[in-house]
Amino acid sequence: MTTDTARRHTGAERANEMTYEQLARELLLVGPAPTNEDLKLRYLDVLIDNGLNPPGPPKRILIVGAGIAGLVAGDLLTRAGHDVTILEANANRVGGRIKTFHAKKGEPSPFADPAQYAEAGAMRLPSFHPLTLALIDKLGLKRRLFFNVDIDPQTGNQDAPVPPVFYKSFKDGKTWTNGAPSPEFKEPDKRNHTWIRTNREQVRRAQYATDPSSINEGFHLTGCETRLTVSDMVNQALEPVRDYYSVKQDDGTRVNKPFKEWLAGWADVVRDFDGYSMGRFLREYAEFSDEAVEAIGTIENMTSRLHLAFFHSFLGRSDIDPRATYWEIEGGSRMLPETLAKDLRDQIVMGQRMVRLEYYDPGRDGHHGELTGPGGPAVAIQTVPEGEPYAATQTWTGDLAIVTIPFSSLRFVKVTPPFSYKKRRAVIETHYDQATKVLLEFSRRWWEFTEADWKRELDAIAPGLYDYYQQWGEDDAEAALALPQSVRNLPTGLLGAHPSVDESRIGEEQVEYYRNSELRGGVRPATNAYGGGSTTDNPNRFMYYPSHPVPGTQGGVVLAAYSWSDDAARWDSFDDAERYGYALENLQSVHGRRIEVFYTGAGQTQSWLRDPYACGEAAVYTPHQMTAFHLDVVRPEGPVYFAGEHVSLKHAWIEGAVETAVRAAIAVNEAPVGDTGVTAAAGRRGAAAATEPMREEALTS
């Protein structure tokens, strides 16, 4: 190797090492050396305590997207005195991928009981996401426990004030909290009554934890693998990775290494594992058998994401942890964006989709566009009304912009001048995953029932109906004879047969599917679960039961099918109406056919890939993408800044969107007044104040 070649190799290695360290800082929210500021503490101060520092002259700021990132940034900047306009493509609601199905004034209720609601998107908030939780508290919203694992309702004390948000910094152990402790608050005990059903074997989670052999043998596992739960397998495989940055104590808990080693350890994790998919890690690094990988993928919900980056599943393993505490917002997750939006009525413009973005960056070859340039606006955004892609455009101008829409959606926006090469690559290549939910409403919370509850409710429909559902192995003719005479001629059969159901609401399509379905359903024990979820290898994959009843109601909405990636793609092939019959049938395979009597015929479904504004559930990198371009995702392009979950390394979480929104707001607030036409807003609020919006045909870049 020549001296020049060696130098080039050394230079490339140094550049790579700097990339790994910077990515570790992004992940951990560590500021630049030498101060190594804890950015989370700073963001908490800005978001919750003191707001942005007083700015210089107010700036005209355009924000694209009224999801949680756009709303948080808009709120901070408006309170700081800037002239903010938030452009939202959706004409009907704010919130982006925070969406709750609920009754709206003047519109048909999504469920038979208008009091019911259910989440189409974000549904749980972990205790280690302090920005989101503290914001919820600051806005006066009520948070309550979300039960990732079902609980014993006779234990704990949830009626006491909820504990405050608490964060302990990696710097000098400094702490932040937003209230006094609440020692009276107690979480209920976990029961693990919910189900795992795979390969026609079904056990409760509690049984699987003590004896996983029957489930594991269904995947053809042998030897010691049959005696380990898949969760234990994965944890054992990940222990060497955790050793990079933390130390295991005698009691099994882990503590972070001293700061420099902790940061360097995470940089080494990025270096050594960003090139792995989760499937490759389990097979090559952990040396699991193919059968073990299949079991892990099915039960731990990794199957459809085994081809995606190791890092996403590794971080998600910490984020969706059965031992962690999770919260939800009473009234639905929608309460968070809607509450923020109330104070931004004058700033939000609904039903305006960005189709063209032009900006002036004096650092780029003196380029100026048709609408931007020296002495004029630095940013011009052109929009069309929702549902009118070929309409004449409306132009909005400003000094700076924050783009919060997903890159999957930004891909369809004309940008002049083009972003830098690495940014364009990130916009083009960032992998967006799929997620699809199917929700079904029932007039009684049968998942909480004991067998005594089942007998009471079924025999209230017709004496002997409980015994009918308990019969097993009969052919259809025998089953028909066993059916009580009083319910043989119901117009919908036993679908929605309970008196609490208005069977006239059950659509003919669903009734026809029900009549022609060969599934009679097995006999299954009462689930008797409060919250939590079950797992199956049928297309529904994951099922979640409500953590809390809606006050004054006896029914509830079950998340009957929750799937990601390729699993979600199968559901996306069906029309919405078709999904309900399949979801009910697959729910019955786990819980027994008798649940049909409480089905109201009402359901809702959400495919985020088919959503025209989201174009996918969330950014989920493939191997190498994080090291290839994530640092370029974060960087602004002249006067254009970026925020959203995809700009963070907390992909798919509200916390990632919030932290990037605060960061973008700080940067825009502190941006110097340069040769970009920054002017004080005059007259009315809104970034179009200094330049009246004009109508014109869409320009090409």
UniProtKB/Swiss-Prot annotation:
Stated consequence of mutating residue 305 to K: Strong decrease in L-glutamate oxidation. Changes substrate specificity, the mutant can use L-histidine, L-phenylalanine and L-leucine
Keywords: FAD, Flavoprotein, Nucleotide-binding, Oxidoreductase, Secreted, Signal, Zymogen
Cofactor needs: FAD
pH profile: Optimum pH is 7.0-8.0 for mature LGOX. Optimum pH is 7.0 for recombinant LGOX expressed in E.coli.
Biotechnology: LGOX has been used as a biosensor to quantify L-glutamate and been applied in quality management of foods and fermentation processes, and can also be used in biosensors for clinical testing apparatus. The alternation of substrate specificity expands the application range of LGOX in industrial, medical and pharmaceutical fields. The LGOX R305E mutant is suitable for the determination of L-arginine.
Highest taxon in the source lineage: Bacteria
Compartment annotation: Secreted
Signal peptide: 1-14
Binding site for FAD: 69, 88-89, 97, 123-124, 354, 409, 645, 653-654
Enzyme class: oxidoreductase
UniProt GO molecular function: L-amino-acid oxidase activity; nucleotide binding
Subunit structure, as described in the record: The LGOX precursor forms homodimers. The mature enzyme is a heterohexamer composed of 2 alpha chains, 2 beta chains and 2 gamma chains (alpha2beta2gamma2).
Biological role stated in the UniProt entry: Catalyzes the oxidative deamination of L-glutamate to 2-ketoglutarate along with the production of ammonia and hydrogen peroxide. Shows strict substrate specificity for L-glutamate, and exhibits only very weak activity with L-aspartate.
Protein name: L-glutamate oxidase precursor
Species of provenance: Streptomyces sp
Upper classification of the organism: Bacteria, Bacillati, Actinomycetota, Actinomycetes, Kitasatosporales
